[in-house]
Amino acid sequence: MTKKQELAIVGGGIGGLTAALALQRAGLAVRVFEQAPELAEVGAGISLSPTAVHGLNHLGLRDVLQREAYAPEDQVVRHYQDARPLSDINRGQSLIKQYGERYYLIHRADLHDALAAAVRANDPAAIVLDHRLVSLKQQGDRVHLTFSNGKQYEVDAAVGADGSRSVVREQLFGPGDPQFTGYIAWRGLVPMAKVPPGVLNPPSGIFVG
């Protein structure tokens, strides 16, 4: 019997877990190494384009999106200072006709939880917590990983999904700080009672300025 290829994914965020689920479905043995002592996701809502929705559907998350996400029919672009409408975007039937799927809004934590549950359903031991990568080396046809807790692993391949200050990237290409692009996005959660009347009609909007 041919042994399954073993892959390590460094980073247990949305990107790392999505990669893990896809590789599991391809028949590979996957370990996700997350530096935090428990799996959690911070942030607010994120948008899922029809292309992303197709990908998540392929990974078996269609029911999760239909249950946890919101699919707006329309979206209004508003000025960030006074919320006046600037333009309208149809997010419903026009996207279905063009791309075959809807546009969804979902809380990051809900998507993250669903991905983690799906990965663990395939292999309860797939996600390894409290493992912060300190070094990664190619040794022959294997990749050797060393973690801050002293543990070491050898795998056939490794995927770096450890964020903007990636240890994997630094090991491969040397040190380098993230470069500011000039764009800023403000994210947060506001109680519905404090939202001015009319701002959430339709209930999906983008504030720019």
Predicted features and spans:
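Structural signature of beta-strand start/N-cap positions in the alpha/beta core
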Residues: 6, 29-31, 151
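Beta1/beta-strand and adjacent pyrophosphate-binding region of the FAD-binding site
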Residues: 2-15
